[in-house]
Amino acid sequence: MHTRAIYPGTFDPITNGHADLIERAAKLFKHVIIGIAANPSKQPRFTLEERVELVNRVTAHLDNVEVVGFSGLLVDFAKEQRASVLVRGLRAVSDFEYEFQLANMNRRLSPDLESVFLTPAEENSFISSTLVKEVALHGGDVSQFVHPEVASALAAKLKLAKA
């Protein structure tokens, strides 16, 4: 088990679904890099630095997990990090088509980079960052969907936005 894997995403914010997949990946691979994409086209609520910090807090108990922000092509980031595997999550069949296209594009751009798909635990299969932000925006309790530190950060971020 000498494989370096990257689990890429925007993580705006990191959810229990993401954390579940990170835990699973950490058991499968020697070293897991959580690649947090700058991704300005998604207009993230949290800055890249804030997202890196939140993911670091949520994954602090995992010795073989490293959190790194990046911009640019994922395949270039994977090469820089000497990773041979991309970990992707599949919540539902609806995720598969996009992930399949992405995996094929990544394979075309970097033939030695393998994509591995993991599914979250059933209780996390419906959670997305978008839904969590939507619930929080309307005053709902997101504590069952995110780590307590993420819930606090999200509440503070929304309070600032309303001020």
UniProtKB/Swiss-Prot annotation:
Pathway listed: Cofactor biosynthesis; coenzyme A biosynthesis; CoA from (R)-pantothenate: step 4/5
Per the record's keyword annotation, is Nucleotide-binding included, yes or no?
yes
Q: Could you say which enzyme class this protein belongs to?
A: transferase
Q: Where does ATP bind?
A: 10-11, 18, 89-91, 99, 124-130
Which cysteines does the record link by disulfide bonds? none
Q: Which CDD domains match?
A: PPAT
**Cofactor(s) this protein cannot do without:** Mg(2+)
GO molecular-function terms, A-Z = ATP binding; pantetheine-phosphate adenylyltransferase activity
| Any one of the GO CC terms | cytoplasm
Question: EC number(s) of the enzyme?
Answer: 2.7.7.3
**Biological-process GO terms, alphabetical:** coenzyme A biosynthetic process
Q: What is its main location?
A: cytoplasm
Site (Transition state stabilizer) residue list: 18
Q: Where in the cell is it found?
A: Cytoplasm
Q: Which domain of life is it from?
A: Bacteria
Binding-site residues, substrate: 10, 42, 74, 88
Q: Which UniProt keywords apply?
A: ATP-binding, Coenzyme A biosynthesis, Cytoplasm, Magnesium, Nucleotide-binding, Nucleotidyltransferase, Transferase
Q: Where are the transmembrane segments?
A: none
Per the record, what are the reactions this protein catalyses? (R)-4'-phosphopantetheine + ATP + H(+) = 3'-dephospho-CoA + diphosphate
Stored InterPro entries: Cyt_trans-like (IPR004821), PPAT (IPR001980), Rossmann-like_a/b/a_fold (IPR014729)
* Complexes and interactors: Homohexamer.
By sequence similarity, the record places it as follows: Belongs to the bacterial CoaD family.
> What is the protein's known function?
Reversibly transfers an adenylyl group from ATP to 4'-phosphopantetheine, yielding dephospho-CoA (dPCoA) and pyrophosphate.
NCBIfam families (alphabetical): coaD_prev_kdtB, cyt_tran_rel
Protein name, per record: Phosphopantetheine adenylyltransferase
Organism lineage:
Bacteria, Pseudomonadati, Pseudomonadota, Gammaproteobacteria, Alteromonadales
Q: Which gene encodes it?
A: coaD
